[in-house]
């Protein structure tokens, strides 16, 4: 089986993707530090907003919806509550460095949704066994 992943905040594209088996839609709300990390690189930074979560979820019958939040910060709990209220099926934690950060995020999520831990930092990779 193959899982397909599409980052979008476009309802029409979400509807088309929803017809495909194994599809996961992905709303990207990460903004904290992203511009600084990607300065000088030929990358695209999304302009997704929290309202996009509900707009995309409303288009889906089969596909699951994942939302990438900001790295752990004082507003994480409020961000999480907002996206879960709009129907996020899973949440992603980016840019964490330590197992303690991931555990803190897990405590905030408190079993309300599956967590996707994005292993994109050297600290995160070193902490895999923890």
Regions found by a protein language model. Give the residues of each.
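Hydrophobic faces of well-ordered beta-strands that scaffold small-molecule active sites
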Residues: 2-8, 25-27, 63-69, 89-93, ...
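Catalytic domains of carbohydrate-active enzymes, especially glycoside hydrolases
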Residues: 7-32, 86-87
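Long, contiguous hydrophobic alpha-helical segments, chiefly transmembrane helices and signal peptides
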Residues: 26-27, 56, 83, 92-96
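Active-site-adjacent beta->alpha loops and helix N-cap segments on the catalytic face
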Residues: 33-56, 73-78, 95-113, 123-129
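A structural motif corresponding to the C-terminal end of an alpha-helix
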Residues: 55-64
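Hydrophobic/aromatic-rich structural module bridging two neighboring secondary-structure elements via a short loop
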Residues: 69-75, 83-90
